[in-house]
Amino acid sequence: MTEAQRHQILLDMLAQLGFVTVENVIERLGISPATARRDINKLDESGKLKKVRNGAEAITQQRPRWTPMNLHQAQNHDEKVRIAKAASQLVNPGESVVINCGSTAFLLGREMCGKPVQIITNYLPLANYLIDQEHDSVIIMGGQYNKSQSITLSPQGSENSLYAGHWMFTSGKGLTADGLYKTDMLTAMAEQKMLSVVGKLVALVDSSKIGERAGMLFSRADQIAMLITGKNANPQVLQQLEAQGVSILRV
């Protein structure tokens, strides 16, 4: 067996198990302890595994986190672009919109930029973009900066209730007949305070999340005026939502 063949088998073991000991490698490949350690060292140096005490660990490849600079890497990017374009068509000149955080939110803000609408947001990447593009009317909701979500969050019972928009556009990690789910509790609670003062709540949810439950229930289905999603969304869930008065737009 060649060195390259040994390395491939070792990597296959890690892909399946996540961790192997030197003894595992010796037994599987029928090689000496010195050869097993040498193989692990070489693969560690080449960045293909992580050497640990008495063995090796697989290296988890994380999906790059999207930013406005690499927006094309956002999951289901093309569908989200269609969703954002459709959402922007709902808003009339002179109206105000609340746009929250996330890749779809940024895409929607980009579609709205330059139009005669007031944009209310706590999402700093979007706010910075709108200011840089000299959008006429931008309101940035104040509060403490949350690094993980790049947003500002206000204390409970703060002045967020003053920011009433004709429309509120938001996304989530899942949507079922029960309603819209979000995984970040602080973000969800901050947005929930605005539900009673906005005109219409529109959920922007790509088709992969329809039928999924993830995190906390942010809003009941009967609180959602409209859902904009992709054409591959679960039809059974869409029927259940329509039965509760939710308008469905598939793009």
From Swiss-Prot:
Database matches in PROSITE patterns: HTH_DEOR_1, HTH_DEOR_2
Keyword Transcription: yes
Chief location of this protein within or outside the cell: cytoplasm
One Pfam match: HTH_DeoR
HTH deoR-type domain residues: 3-58
Cytoplasm as UniProt keyword: yes
GO BP terms, alphabetized: negative regulation of DNA-templated transcription; regulation of DNA-templated transcription
Domain of life of the native organism: Bacteria
Subcellular location per the Swiss-Prot or TrEMBL entry: Cytoplasm
DNA-binding region: 20-39
SUPFAM superfamilies tied to this protein: NagB/RpiA/CoA transferase-like, Winged helix' DNA-binding domain
A GO CC annotation given for this chain: cytoplasm
One Gene Ontology term of the molecular function aspect: cis-regulatory region sequence-specific DNA binding
Keywords carried by this UniProt record: Cytoplasm, DNA-binding, Repressor, Transcription, Transcription regulation
Coiled coil: none
Entry function: Represses ulaG and the ulaABCDEF operon.
The protein's name in its UniProt record: HTH-type transcriptional regulator UlaR
Annotated source species: Salmonella typhimurium (strain LT2 / SGSC1412 / ATCC 700720)
Taxonomy of the source species: Bacteria, Pseudomonadati, Pseudomonadota, Gammaproteobacteria, Enterobacterales
Protein's gene: ulaR
